[in-house]
Amino acid sequence: LLGLFGKRKATLVLGLDISSTTVKLLELSYTGGRYRVESYAVSSLPQDAVIEKSVNDVEGVSNAIRTVVAQSRTKLKNVAAAVAGSSVITKLIDMPQGLSEDDMEIQLTLEADQYIPYPLEEVAIDFEVQGPAPDRDNQVEVLLAACRRETIESRVEAIEGSELVPKIMDVEAYAMERAFSLVRNQLDLDEESTVAIVDIGATMTTLSVLSDGQTIYTREQLFGGKQLTDEIMRRYGLPLEEAGLAKKQGGLPDDYEPEVLEPFKEAVVQQVARSLQFFFSSSQYNDVDHIILAGGVSSMEGLEELVREKLGTPTSVANPFAQMSISSSVNAVALGSDAPAMMIACGLALRSFD
């Protein structure tokens, strides 16, 4: 079985988030009722090493993982990584109460082809008991998750190639839920609040809507910070690396803000609004209580206010580390600016304390 949920006694694991343009690594500890950031690092990936969430260049990804391990100076070897929700099929199934894990595994393996549209030899499956089945006596509700082996294997290969040990392969949506539980405490949101997390990465934007802390809707679309970088390259004739730096550090001509940056921010707001419309039209909801912006783009100055003002919904930028202590060896300023992009890495590192 896959270990998507990692049914084993908790060991300390590094959270390793492999996105389309970067590898992010995070190590947490927990003492005296408080989490502490022990080490972290972010490294960029070679172009096209990961395409739309699939590892395309195993060696390129391995090298980037080696870089973050060296930068972070972590001593840990065990890793929790994740696959994108779009590559995982999940189904809730009822099963007889009182079955042992082994019996469940046998029965699910026999019945899995009813639920999964791929040949069974091509998929890895895992399951987790959710609790008693509502309205059905002597039955439990079981979450079955299946993912194509090649999706997992390319990630496993990249991790092993960097001399780390892949202990847990999670799903990004579940990692996001775990990190959200930290953010929710800071925002004083009710348990039952409906919250939209908009994770804007370099090439992908993922909307996750959570109610009662559980994901009830996700949607991925191709849109991200790379569009801004591409526009800087096109307009000012800069190579990729310089454009990326200028975007972060400034030094672009005066027309950059009004002509490039502001229209990009407006485009972000439109993407958020459109994603939410898709959610509203496919559910009985017609509003959300709070919007949380995550991902590298979200810390862009003024974006939080713009989303709040245009959509009329309380909005904040994710910082999973706000209530954590930080080791003296960690650059707290850098961590603060990377924080919104570290949600998935954080949710994965939290697997240490299952």
Tell me the role of every PLM-derived stretch.
Residues D230, R234-R235, E242-H290, V297:
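Adenine-nucleotide phosphate-binding core of ATP-dependent small-molecule kinases
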Residues L261-F264, D287-S316, P320-A322:
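Glycine-rich phosphate-binding loops at beta-strand->alpha-helix junctions
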Residues S39-A70, D255-V260, F264, A332-G336:
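N-terminal phosphate-binding loop and adjacent alpha-helix
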Residues L2-S44, K77-A82, Q186-Y217, G224-Q227, ...:
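Gly/Thr-rich phosphate-binding beta-strand-loop-beta motif of the actin/hexokinase/Hsp70
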Residues K9-A10, G60-R73, Q186-S193, R274-F279:
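Phosphate-interacting basic helix/loop segments used at nucleotide- and nucleic-acid interfaces
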Residues A82-R184, H290, P320-I326, A341-I344, ...:
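Active-site neighborhood for divalent-cation/phosphate handling
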Residues V50, E150-R178, Q214-D254:
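Glycine-rich phosphate-binding loop plus the immediately following alpha-helix
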